[in-house]
Structure formats: C-alpha cells, structure tokens
C-alpha cells in the first residue's frame, strides 16, 4: 500500500478536486482500493491502461523509486516522487546501485520532509535542487484521524489498556541476496519466546499490535491467537477501515528499529522503543547513512524480550526522552507546516488549488 499516494488522493476527493480533475488510482489490489475511495475515483489494475494513463495524465504521483514504468515525464507533465520515507539505509548512489535511467531525469518534483532529509535524498539520488518540495509526508495527516478510545473499542480492549504498535523493517531479502547466514526471520521474537512476551504484556495490561511488512515471510506464530499480541497485515487494516497512520496516531508508543516511520511518529511526540538485537549484522550488511543517529536514538533500546517489555513499561510510566524526540523532529520534519495540512501543502506547491 502506498500511503502517501492514498493520503493525497483522499484529500483530493474530500476537497472536491474531482470536479476539476479525473482521479485515477492504479493498483494490483483493486478490491481493497475500492473500499478506500469514493466512486468518483477511477480504479484500474490493467497494466496497459496504467501505462497509458501515466503517459497521458498531467500529474502523476509515485511513491517508489523503481515503479513499474520508469521513463521521462511527457511534455508539460509533472511526475511527482512522494517517496515512502527518508532513507536510513544506504540506497542508490550510496549503495552503488546503477540503473539504465538517471533518477533526476525521471521525476519533475521530489518530496522531502525537511532540508536535512533533502540533503540525504541528494546524496542517494543526485536530485537537482530545483525539484525539491519540502513538506512532511502527506500520510502523516492520518495521525490525527483516529482516537485511542475508538481504537480500543475496535480491538475489544478495555479503556485502560495501553497500546504499542510494532513496525519492524524488512530484513530477509537483503540478507539472503548478500549471502549472510545470520539473518533473523523477525527481530527479537521467536516461537520459543513469544509466549513469554505475551505473559509479560498481559501483566502490565499492554497490547502490542505487530504490523507486518508486506514482504515479511510469514512465520507460524503469526497465525496464533494471543491475548496481548495482535498480528496485522494491510488486509486487516482495510477490513477495519483504518490506515496504518491512523493506527499509529491512536497508539501509546511505537516499537521499531531501522525504519523511517520513527521520523513520522516524532510528529505526535509519543514514546519510541528501539529493537536493536541485530544492529551490528544489519549495519555491516546494509549500512546506515547517518550512523551517529542510531548511536543516539531518542528512546530505550531492547535486545531481547525482557528488555522490550521493560522498555515499554518505562516509557509509558515516565517519558524521559521527550526533549530528544523534539530535537530530532525539528531536524527531520519541517516545523512551519501544521500537522493535518501536509497533503494540501504539497498540492499548493504544485499549483493545484481547489
């Protein structure tokens, strides 16, 4: 699911841009997309039609660097790269990746949430400065769309239950491609310790929602029912009529690792716990763009189940990292733009008005 594209299209639909523009969403999952958008949005999944509309549309929004049809924008067309997060791992130029195309040639405008984030984009992809749009990601508008009480009701939890959302980054493919034998299937959790984690969470009246990466290899314990651990995928969120970011906005804390979602979560200034059990192997195999940042993360770190539960309990009891989160947020997200106005700001910077 391309969350920035969805947030942009949702804002456009809600604000009557459909009266001025035909809105088309290309996807390989039209059934799920149909649930998310009104009938005024045309949903297509045929690749030939998708390529035709990419070539013939005035504005094209993409979220991946290697989307299906890479080519120069057509005459008077704007190809807008929204990105799916500020790179943390070495990618593009820093990963010695080569393509038949130039990154700078195929995009008319490129989104970055801050000037510092833009400097990372330039290192990775050699984008020209005149293509930048500085604005936090439109998907972050959804952080305001769900309150905690409603989320607990949807999940069947009591009013006093604390909710942590766990978003592990994807690991396996990179490790396998690069011949590493120490690839974890999943950070910290195994079939041998997941019941221990569940028991410790139950004692502290905390429920952890694990949102699995779309490419995560499915493990046996994902399909087991636990009292205080819930595994979710994109389909489950669609069925609940929720987005990942509305789920994050209603949570009490985030658990993550080497994922750019941590920069988005800074906008709500809630605690973050970092799982770092494979930090050194991940660093050696993948590499970090800003290693110092991960030596000074704004939250406690956990190497095992016991440390994870203790870290969650500590940040939900006494938040000792608020100042550090605020400092990092100012670095990673442009302050002057109000949360809830990000999609609108991107449209305005492109000259698209209601």
Regions flagged by a language model, labelled:
Residues 1, 29-32, 65-68, 85-88, ...:
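Short, solvent-exposed loop/turn segments at secondary-structure junctions
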Residues 1-144:
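Active-site and donor-binding regions of nucleotide-sugar-utilizing enzymes
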Residues 3-12, 138-225, 302:
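Conserved catalytic-core segment of nucleotide-activated headgroup transferases in glycan assembly
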Residues 43-57, 215-260:
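Donor nucleotide-activated moiety binding/catalytic core segment of transferases
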Residues 59, 78, 109, 163, ...:
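Structural motif
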Residues 60-83, 87, 239-286:
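A donor-sugar binding/catalytic signature common to diverse glycosyltransferases
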Residues 225-227, 260-332:
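Catalytic binding pocket for nucleotide-activated donors in carbohydrate/polymer assembly enzymes
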Residues 336-354:
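C-terminal alpha-helical cap of glycosyltransferases
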């Amino acid at each position: 699911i391309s969350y920035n594209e969805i947030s942009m299209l949702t804002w456009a639909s809600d604000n009557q841009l459909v009266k001025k523009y035909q809105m088309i969403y290309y996807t390989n999952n039209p059934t799920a997309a149909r649930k998310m958008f009104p009938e005024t949005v045309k949903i297509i999944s045929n690749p030939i039609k998708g390529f035709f509309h990419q070539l013939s549309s005035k504005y094209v929004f993409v979220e991946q660097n290697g989307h299906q049809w890479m080519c120069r924008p057509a005459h008077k067309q704007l190809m807008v790269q929204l990105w799916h997060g500020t790179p943390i791992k070495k990618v593009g130029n820093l990963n010695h990746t080569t393509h038949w195309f130039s990154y700078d040639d195929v995009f008319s405008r490129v989104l970055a949430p801050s000037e510092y984030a833009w400097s990372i984009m330039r290192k990775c992809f050699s984008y020209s400065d005149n293509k930048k749009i500085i604005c936090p990601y439109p998907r972050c508008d959804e952080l305001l769309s769900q309150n905690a009480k409603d989320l607990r009701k949807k999940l069947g939890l009591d009013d006093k239950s604390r909710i942590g959302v766990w978003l592990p980054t994807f690991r396996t493919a990179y490790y396998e491609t690069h011949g590493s034998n120490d690839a974890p299937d999943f950070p910290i959790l195994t079939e041998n310790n997941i019941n221990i984690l569940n028991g410790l969470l139950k004692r502290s009246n905390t429920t952890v929602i694990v949102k699995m990466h779309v490419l995560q290899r499915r493990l046996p314990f994902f399909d087991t029912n636990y009292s205080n651990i819930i595994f979710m995928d994109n389909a489950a969120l669609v069925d609940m009529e929720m987005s990942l970011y509305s789920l994050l906005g209603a949570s009490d804390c985030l658990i993550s690792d080497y994922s750019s979602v941590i920069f988005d979560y800074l906008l709500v200034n809630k605690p973050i716990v970092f799982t770092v059990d494979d930090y050194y192997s991940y660093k050696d195999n993948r590499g970090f763009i800003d290693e110092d940042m991960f030596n000074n993360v704004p939250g406690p770190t956990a190497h095992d189940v016991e440390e994870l539960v203790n870290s969650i309990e500590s940040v939900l009891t006494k938040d000792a990292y608020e100042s550090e989160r605020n400092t990092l947020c100012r670095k990673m997200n442009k302050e002057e733009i109000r949360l809830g106005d990000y999609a609108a700001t991107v449209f305005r910077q492109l000259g698209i008005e209601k």
